[in-house]
Regions:
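Zn-dependent metallopeptidase/amidohydrolase metal-coordination segment
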Residues: 8, 13-16, 340, 347-349, ...
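Glycine/charged-rich beta-loop-alpha catalytic/anionic-binding loops adjacent to active sites
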Residues: 100-114, 216-218, 420-425, 457-461
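Midchain, well-structured core segments that form catalytic/ion-binding scaffolds
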Residues: 27, 107-110, 150-151, 157-369
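Active-site-adjacent substrate-binding region
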Residues: 223, 230-232, 237-253, 405-448
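Active-site metal-coordination/substrate-binding segment of hydrolases
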Residues: 69-145, 149-151, 156-167, 207, ...
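Acidic/His- and Gly-rich active-site-bordering loop/insert found
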Residues: 2-107
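His/Asp/Glu-rich mid-to-C-terminal helical/loop segments that flank catalytic regions of hydrolases
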Residues: 162, 228-245, 274-277, 323-329, ...
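Substrate-recognition/cap regions that form aromatic- and gly/pro-loop-enriched pockets
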Residues: 345-430, 434
């Protein structure tokens, strides 16, 4: 690890930050993590570790116990290789080719104009740093690095029985220091499709592009309760309120880029009679001020644009336009229900994540999350009803299970005691409203004892993503102490 790419390699703990620096230099968005996987395989092989790969593409690395620790229970350190590729509209960045550019910003590390990939790159770096260490005491170690967690949990779905020998799994994909997770929400993707016909834009109409941007966005699980605006829903609300009075014809609607990120930006191309241009401008300006008044405490950066546009496309027919706008406006979004069992935790939510328009159809991609299967089913049923009323089709796919909390977890008790021993107070034991791979690992490995912990990462899945530097040291200290505290096999 002699080649460093940025100033972050000087931070402490040095081995972890140096690995993260290297990770940032190798492109690894979801579905394109092969170069990074290959780098890790080559490095681990050079170190003399036992390295394997399953048919799905997950990477397995084994490190023997340090002397005197051979009888400890085996531990699996786990992270995912891929990162969410999100950039600001004005950032020129190809996630499949260009390195992430991390830099130190006060107490934080962030990236220039893009997601940082601290989710889950810091966790992955911690696993590699344990492998590289010569002075950490630990029992038998396995590292499991999964692929494509962010875009479908492909690696976790593909994990089969027989590949792992450990008794305990430490998932490193949590994002708040001082919290340790023992359960998570399950989820399912929903895709609503509207078949549309088009008519020529009438003579005397002008074409405009309306843009709403500058919203915070964020993770559609961890941030769904924060009251942040959803650009798709907010632009849909404007159309629902004013399309008829403006005699507006919809040409295109596009917004968001990932089903699991709250959309920060949305764009519509519309045609209006030339004499209604001024009215459109007045109403859109008024709506912008309305949003600032409603959301200004949370959304401090709202901006809108109303610009001239040139299009060769035709407009939606009046009937198809009305069906789509009404359905988008009626579609539920955000927190559906808070948990009765765990105070302050979201039970069920929905994110209207991505809208795309093609010549003859519009697609709306949503992600439903819930701690309970019946909650998920209820929101599926609601979406089906909206689609049915609007004459749209809806399909659900990619369901993954939640991770049910285990009150008798031995590793949770060990983590709690270790944490209290270091800091003098207990950690917050939590259930997270997001998809962790642990729920899927329980299927091939039902007896695996698991916890999830990590450093403080703010605004994951958005270009504002940042990791708090001092919490990375705390996370590392906890990892080292935990490995030493693992009990012997019964």
């Amino acid at each position: 690890m002699s080649e460093f790419h940025s100033e972050i390699s000087t931070l402490s703990p040095a081995p972890l930050w140096q690995f993260f620096d290297k990770i940032c230099s190798i492109p690894h968005p979801s579905k394109h993590e092969e170069a990074l996987a290959q780098y890790i395989i080559n490095w681990a092989t050079e170190q003399g570790f036992d390295v394997r790969r399953d048919p799905t593409g997950n990477v397995f690395i084994k490190k023997p116990a340090t002397p005197g620790m051979e009888n400890k229970k085996g531990v699996v350190l786990q992270a995912h290789i891929d990162m969410v590729p999100q950039k600001n509209e004005d950032t020129d960045h190809d996630f499949t080719k260009d390195p992430i550019q991390p830099y130190i910003d006060g107490e934080w590390v962030t990236a220039k104009g893009t997601t940082l990939g601290a989710d889950n790159g810091i966790g992955m770096a911690s696993c590699l740093a344990v492998l590289a260490s010569k002075d950490i005491k630990h029992g038998p170690i396995e590292v499991l690095l999964t692929i494509d967690e962010e875009a479908g949990m492909t690696g976790a779905f593909g994990l089969e029985a027989g590949w792992l020998e450990g008794d305990i799994l430490l998932n490193t994909d949590s994002e708040q220091e001082g919290e340790v997770y023992m359960g998570c929400a399950g989820g399912i993707d929903g895709a609503m499709t509207f078949d549309i016909k088009r008519d020529a834009i009438p003579t005397g109409f002008v074409t405009r592009q309306l843009t709403l941007k500058g919203l915070k966005g964020g993770h559609s699980g961890c941030d769904i309760h924060t009251g942040r605006g959803n650009a798709n829903k907010l632009l849909g609300r404007f159309l629902a309120g004013h399309a008829q009075e403006l005699d507006l014809r919809l040409v295109e609607f596009r917004g968001g880029s990932l089903r699991n990120a709250i959309p920060r930006e949305a764009f519509v191309t519309v045609a209006v009679p030339a004499e209604n241009q001024e009215k459109l401008a007045e109403l859109f300006n008024y709506y912008t001020e309305l949003l600032k008044a409603e959301l200004g405490k949370v959304e401090t950066g709202i901006v809108t644009f109303n610009e001239e546009s040139v299009t060769e496309s035709q407009a939606f027919t009046a009937a198809d336009q009305q069906r789509f706008i009404a359905a988008l406006n009626a579609c539920p979004n955000g927190v559906m229900r808070m948990s009765d069992e765990i105070e302050g935790v979201v039970e069920t939510s929905l994110n209207v994540g991505v809208i795309t328009t093609e010549e003859n159809k519009v697609t709306v991609l949503c992600l439903i999350r819930s701690l309970i299967d019946s909650g998920r089913s209820q929101v599926e049923s609601t979406l089906r009803s909206v689609a049915e009323l609007a004459g749209a089709q809806v399909e659900f796919s990619g369901a993954y299970p939640g991770w049910k909390p285990d009150a008798d977890s031995e590793i949770m008790a060990i983590f709690r005691d270790m944490y209290e021993g270091i800091y003098g107070h207990k950690p917050n034991i939590m259930v997270i409203h997001a998809g962790l791979e642990c729920g899927l690992f329980k299927e091939p490995y039902p007896n695996m004892d698991m916890v999830s912990f990590g450093p403080t990462i703010k605004f994951p899945h958005s270009p504002d993503e940042k990791v708090k530097i001092d919490t990375v040291q705390l996370f590392w200290d906890q990892m080292v102490a935990l490995l030493e505290a693992i009990p012997e096999k019964a």
